[in-house]
Amino acid sequence: MKIKAVLNRDGGTFKTTDMQTYCESATRAFAAKGHELVCDVVPGAEIVDALESASGEAGLDALLAGGGDGTISTAAGIAWKAGLPLGVIPAGTMNLFARSLKLPLDIWKVLDLLAGAKVANVDIATANGRPFVHQFSAGLHARMVRMRNQMDFASRIGKIRASTSAAFGVMLDPPRFEVVFDIDGDGRSDERPISAISVSNNPLGNNSLFFADRVDTGKLGVYLAEPLEPTGVGKLAFDILRGKFKENEAVTASTAERVHLHFPKYRKGAACVLDGELLRMPPDVEIKIHAGELKVLVAPEQPTA
């Protein structure tokens, strides 16, 4: 197989990695399995162009992407549109999609697995046509990300500290807004006040990091939190930390294949988060699951005794 690896040298672990040595190790690992790997290391500002350029190369059989969740989300959308299998090298802070794919989270150990991987079909979702592999969210999460982005941090530990500080800030002043939602186009729109909404690519698992245990169910996870006071946000945060947020009395959980969201009291400057990226929120959001349309590299099945 002819494979191209595009690595974000500004992404998490790669900031402190000798990238020449890493690419040499990757090339050897794939050559040992009979593959031809070309490694391209680029700064974060050039990652989108590099991924798009790689996806258009003639004769390419698979695309590898290395970086944080933002890089992987971008790569997934590009690979999906190009019809290429995507290999994930988890070099970020959370590495949520890599966790869902049950990949090693060590950038060195994952090379041997990807070199001998099989291709699997998993789901990808879109929000107003924009692909994502983790989640769309508004309310509590968006406010926290906005506050975190206003802080200075230059390392993984710094980002975690900034996130913790932002979480406390949101806890003291939780948002409240109206949403009208229609699930699966059944025509029964429901309007309610909430403090948070999250729509995930597959239902989230019982874990504290908010990632899906599987990404091949063909369903979105839909989660709404009713209007919360600071004490309610604190209780929700505690339930999230122990991996039991769906048991929180303020949370309503369901699944769907398509969700339409309308924000009747939309105001300019309102924000949402899509796979960790803070974006301006439109007044209407159409979210769809594209079941089995993304090809990914995963661990080969182990023979049974």
Please tell me what each predicted stretch does:
Residues 65-70:
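N-terminal glycine-rich "phosphate-gripper" loop used for MgATP/nucleotide binding
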Residues 16, 185-187, 191, 224-305:
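ATP/nucleoside-binding phosphotransfer catalytic cores, i.e., glycine-rich phosphate-binding loops
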Residues 175-177, 193-195, 216-221, 255-257:
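A generic structural signal for short beta-strands and their flanking turns/coil linkers
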Residues 47-48, 72-73, 206-207, 281:
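Short, well-ordered alpha-helical microsegments
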Residues 150-161, 208, 212-232:
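Gly/Ser/Thr-rich active-site loops/lids in small-molecule metabolic enzymes
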Residues 137, 198-211, 278:
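Glycine-rich phosphate/pyrophosphate-binding beta-alpha loops
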Residues 4-6, 15, 24, 33, ...:
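Catalytic core of DAGKc-family lipid kinases
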